[in-house]
Amino acid sequence: MRDEIATAVFFVTRLVKKHEKLSTQQIETFALKLMTILFEKYRGHWHPDCPSKGQAFRCIRINNNENKDPVLERACAESNVNFFHLGLPKEMTIWVDPYEVCCRYGEKKHPFTIASFKGRWENWELAQHVSCAVNRATGDCSSGTSSDEESCSREAQIIPKVNNPKSVYQVENFKQSLQPWFCLPRRKHLADGRGFLPGAACHPVPKSSKWCRPASRRVDRYHWVNAQLFSGQTAPGEPGEEALSSLKQK
């Protein structure tokens, strides 16, 4: 019960904070009062073996027929806060049930999950889901689906796989064309011929250079990343730390 109530209070206070009508101290006082009231109300009405039992009693609801939820109104009264300064949506329902906290923004829209406690959660994961739920409740994200767990998450960036067995990059499906690499602009740290790029064919290396790689077509975008760079033994003409850090950002 503690985690579910804390999540509901965190969700409400995030909505209040986004409205920017109350000070930080007022929000903290309101959150403390709301949590205390919810613990008092839900004690004796919490059934982990049957989460749906007492669901209507535990829900926090605001709509056109009842524009002030009794629990929120009491928390405002005990913390000396104007209810309408909370800036909550005109139609919103929050269900605080064992193992799950859900919300519905609008009476005719589908509910979505704020947090589910059926598995283990890290603090940052919970905060991310609550933040996304706040965005949905304030209209920043689409609210037509029943779950938004993936709608506000970032896609993982994958480094393509390369064919060099010495390369540190071993991710699948390298299909990117090599043509753009032959049109890179000249960089200051490569002007003296100390560094090498596949695109160096556009800029001749000075004759004084004692060693350089042939400008043949490469099948490995990261062929310059090899064991020598990480063992500290860099061959003449191989890119140094400055060139390495610059190229890895591309």
Swiss-Prot record:
<protein>
    <recommendedName>
        <fullName>Protein BTG4</fullName>
    </recommendedName>
</protein>
<dbReference type="InterPro" id="IPR036054">
    <property type="entry name" value="BTG-like_sf"/>
</dbReference>
<dbReference type="GO" id="GO:0160021">
    <property type="term" value="P:maternal-to-zygotic transition of gene expression"/>
</dbReference>
<comment type="function">
    <text>Adapter protein that bridges CNOT7, a catalytic subunit of the CCR4-NOT complex, to EIF4E, and facilitates maternal mRNAs decay during the maturation of oocytes and in the fertilized egg. It is therefore required for the maternal-zygotic transition (MZT), zygotic cleavage and initiation of embryonic development.</text>
</comment>
<dbReference type="InterPro" id="IPR002087">
    <property type="entry name" value="Anti_prolifrtn"/>
</dbReference>
<comment type="similarity">
    <text>Belongs to the BTG family.</text>
</comment>
<comment type="subunit">
    <text>Interacts with CNOT7 and EIF4E. Interacts with CNOT8.</text>
</comment>
<dbReference type="InterPro" id="IPR033332">
    <property type="entry name" value="BTG"/>
</dbReference>
<dbReference type="GO" id="GO:0003730">
    <property type="term" value="F:mRNA 3'-UTR binding"/>
</dbReference>
<dbReference type="Pfam" id="PF07742">
    <property type="entry name" value="BTG"/>
</dbReference>
<dbReference type="GO" id="GO:0005829">
    <property type="term" value="C:cytosol"/>
</dbReference>
<dbReference type="GO" id="GO:0045930">
    <property type="term" value="P:negative regulation of mitotic cell cycle"/>
</dbReference>
